[in-house]
Amino acid sequence: MSRLIVKNLPNGMKEERFRQLFAAFGTLTDCSLKFTKDGKFRKFGFIGFKSEEEAQAALNHFHRSFIDTTRITVEFCKSFGDPSKPRAWSKHAQKSSQPKQPSQDSVPSDTKKDKKKKGPSDLEKLKEDAKFQEFLSIHQKRTQVATWANDALEAKLPKAKTKASSDYLNFDSDSNSDSGQESEEEPAREDPEEEQGLQPKAAVQKELSDMDYLKSKMVRAEVSSEDEDEEDSEDEAVNCEEGSEEEEEEGSPASPAKQGGVSRGAVPGVLRPQEAAGKVEKPVSQKEPTTPYTVKLRGAPFNVTEKNVIEFLAPLKPVAIRIVRNAHGNKTGYVFVDLSSEEEVKKALKCNRDYMGGRYIEVFREKQAPTARGPPKSTTPWQGRTLGENEEEEDLADSGRLFVRNLSYTSSEEDLEKLFSAYGPLSELHYPIDSLTKKPKGFAFVTFMFPEHAVKAYAEVDGQVFQGRMLHVLPSTIKKEASQEANAPGSSYKKKKEAMDKANSSSSHNWNTLFMGPNAVADAIAQKYNATKSQVFDHETRGSVAVRVALGETQLVQEVRSFLIDNGVCLDSFSQAAAERSKTVILAKNLPAGTLAAEIQETFSRFGSLGRVLLPEGGITAIVEFLEPLEARKAFRHLAYSKFHHVPLYLEWAPIGVFGAAPQKKDSQHEQPAEKAEVEQETVLDPEGEKASVEGAEASTGKMEEEEEEEEEEEEESIPGCTLFIKNLNFSTTEETLKGVFSKVGAIKSCTISKKKNKAGVLLSMGFGFVEYKKPEQAQKALKQLQGHTVDGHKLEVRISERATKPALTSTRKKQVPKKQTTSKILVRNIPFQANQREIRELFSTFGELKTVRLPKKMTGTGAHRGFGFVDFITKQDAKKAFNALCHSTHLYGRRLVLEWADSEVTVQTLRRKTARHFQEPPKKKRSAVLDGILEQLEDEDNSDGEQALQL
């Protein structure tokens, strides 16, 4: 835990001083003091460190220490939702939503406090008591009751008046909804005693003048006339509906006219509680739009229902239907329909000028909903966010995408990847940074490969402390698929192909590190040897044009490799296709010949800050390094397969570790210009226009060959008698210790200790191992000198092993394991079918004299070859020279040649030996018999050792 809570701080504590106190113990990621809503300091605060060690050091130093004259308490924070977290007792803390259970030790109910609380409930009961209402009517003030009024008749007059008013309203109304509404309001007015006791009638109020009484009667007539006018005009009805809904939402008092229409005869400006409760409120779905895709129907019948609207828009499925009513509940002929997408809106607009129940319907797009006031304000501002144009909402169990906020500004992508990769493999991690300061913005998007892993991470990471800050994890929206636009009916094949290539640009199946286009190769070769491009592609000259271009590409590749090595690039990282890729280094390929480094820098610098930009002399392949991973991804996404000059730009993520240490400059640099001059003299085009690419290819590989020949040692097959079997090893002995003991005798080829997994999956030593020497003489010497030697308290038992050493445990991930050269024969795969044996011979004869070239054909023996062949050189040195030159990136007719070392030939003697072993070896024993034999052999050895000890 790297987050601390500091309690009992002094009143005068400021955030700057609070930060300075803890800044000496490490990097602070959060510092906050807590205040009430009124600005009063609550005497505690939170401090966050980047690591747990820094937080622990600060806790040990400040816990129970003094700041000014107050002793503070420093503790580790608890994660959100931790069951061991104490319950909040402060009045400022958020109260729990669970209902409180009544305690048994409650205060007696006859206290004054309880009497005050029970007063309103008792008064409600007295309102229903007829005798109490009669008591109130008798004891009214004489100024409020006429002296000639009959107390016995007052209870009947309100009921008769209510009935008359109801009849009058029913007679005046044309809508069935009004009668239904009045029927709901009638029970609220059937309490004459309540009317008599609480609110006297307007006719008997002495302080009410005659003019005011007449005005109250005139209001009712104006409302009825307004009803008729609003039914005639549809536009005014919509406006009235908007105004009425706004007043209901704001809760503002109604105008006298509307009060008169609602109270049905009550005193103006007074609305009884029973009538307010009986008033029918519209549901929220009729007031506010639920989606931003809304259409408006005009001219709908006044008896329209939601079912009619659904049938009218079939087969669309509306999200919500809002039938507009005026202030009195009458339908106005306007209907607002909320749809789920823009496509459904376009389909709904096609229903314009159709008929619904004999009425002509007009359909419009409603850009701004009439009754929408925006999403309701919530205490959580991240909720209720309107989706963007390129976003769509999807369940977390389907998308697997999380939105992580409140991240530390000192955290990095590696930290987040380490945190979330513990729950499952990640497919994408987007951590935005500020374009000016290059610092994180404090939030990130994490996409898991499997959505169930995202659900697990969402449940466990939300509320956890990460680098001193409490994380807040939410399900994220997902981006709309851009491929839908490319697959539109009107899209051309070219656009579809470009969209598909751009979508698959980061896939590893199309990665070729040193790819060079044939057109760029021809331009570079022609420029280098002062020739024209037509001379390079001249098919009338001697030799194949495809072979000529392939040899030119091989020469350029060798020059590029030499340039990269001189600039500190580790070429070994390019050998593994399955190696992990960098997040900041990009390989830019398929560049036109003569490209300048300034052009590459200008193209890529638009997306962020660049580090190193390497461009060889030919200008065909470049390496671009970004300082921030986010900017590198942005550049890769925008520039992949984009047009650069007149060719598409191919991008590839470089392997990790591509930039190594800068190599030391050799003393033979002064010899390079002379060698280069000799190469140029040998590679001048002849009068017929043929390029002497043979000498150029040999000279370009000379430097690489010399370095490899110095370290080259003929690796032969394992010779019998070179491997030792060591028993009685200590279980704690490691391979390094064992190798150090046996390496004193001679050069060790390999050293392994056999291990097995226990139930927990941990590899444990089995007590024996194998040591393989390069020569049998060294193994015999070690057998004599180290027999009985003590290692980690155990005497070793050494003998010659009769079998090969066990292979080391390898990962399940497939990697390219190059075969060792055992013969002078090379297996060539991916040969184009239009290539013939003469062209293959011409290509490989550049590097040495050939013995045979064979292209196997199908079983019939006719037709084209099968796409692979065997090239056998006379010497192994020539074979290795050709292999090192052509294995990197050589294309023949546009197909890359894949080279492997062929297996050694099976001779007649080998076949005879194998056949004899098959017939002479005894049948295999059962496993139990083999184990018994091993145990007997061990017992015999122990007995013989005991006899030798007795003799001594």
UniProtKB/Swiss-Prot annotation:
Disruption phenotype: Arrests embryonic development prior to implantation. Embryos at 3.5 dpc lack the mature, tripartite nucleoli, but instead, contain spheres resembling nucleolar precursor body (NPB), indicating arrest of nucleologenesis.
Subcellular location: Nucleus, Nucleolus; Nucleus, Nucleoplasm; Cytoplasm; Chromosome
Tissue occurrence: Expressed in the crypts of Lieberkuhn of the intestine (at protein level).
GO-annotated cellular components: chromosome; cytoplasm; nucleolus; nucleoplasm
Biased composition (Polar residues): 163-180
Highest taxon listed in the record's lineage: Eukaryota
Major site of localization recorded for this protein: nucleus
Domain (RRM) ranges: 2-79, 293-368, 400-478, 584-656, 722-803, 824-904
Record-level Gene Ontology MF annotations: RNA binding
InterPro entries cross-referenced by the UniProt entry: Nucleotide-bd_a/b_plait_sf (IPR012677), RBD_domain_sf (IPR035979), RBM19_RRM3 (IPR034419), RBM19_RRM4 (IPR034420), RBM19_RRM5 (IPR034423), RBM19_RRM6 (IPR034421), RMB19_RRM1 (IPR034418), RMB19_RRM2 (IPR034417)
Low complexity: bias regions: 95-109
Keyword Repeat: yes
GO BP annotations listed: positive regulation of embryonic development
Segments of this protein annotated with the region Disordered: 85-126, 159-267, 367-395, 481-504, 664-719
Basic and acidic residues bias locations: 664-679
Modified residues (Phosphoserine): 177, 179, 183, 693, 928, 944
Pfam families xrefs: RRM_1
Glycyl lysine isopeptide (Lys-Gly) (interchain with G-Cter in SUMO2) crosslink site(s): 479
Composition bias, Acidic residues: 181-196, 224-251, 705-718
Keyword field: Chromosome, Cytoplasm, Developmental protein, Isopeptide bond, Nucleus, Phosphoprotein, Repeat, RNA-binding, Ubl conjugation
CDD domains registered for this protein in UniProt: RRM1_RBM19, RRM2_RMB19, RRM3_RBM19, RRM4_RBM19, RRM5_RBM19_like, RRM6_RBM19
Function statement: Plays a role in embryo pre-implantation development.
Family designation: Belongs to the RRM MRD1 family.
Protein name: Probable RNA-binding protein 19
Organism: Mus musculus (Mouse)
Gene from which the chain derives: Rbm19
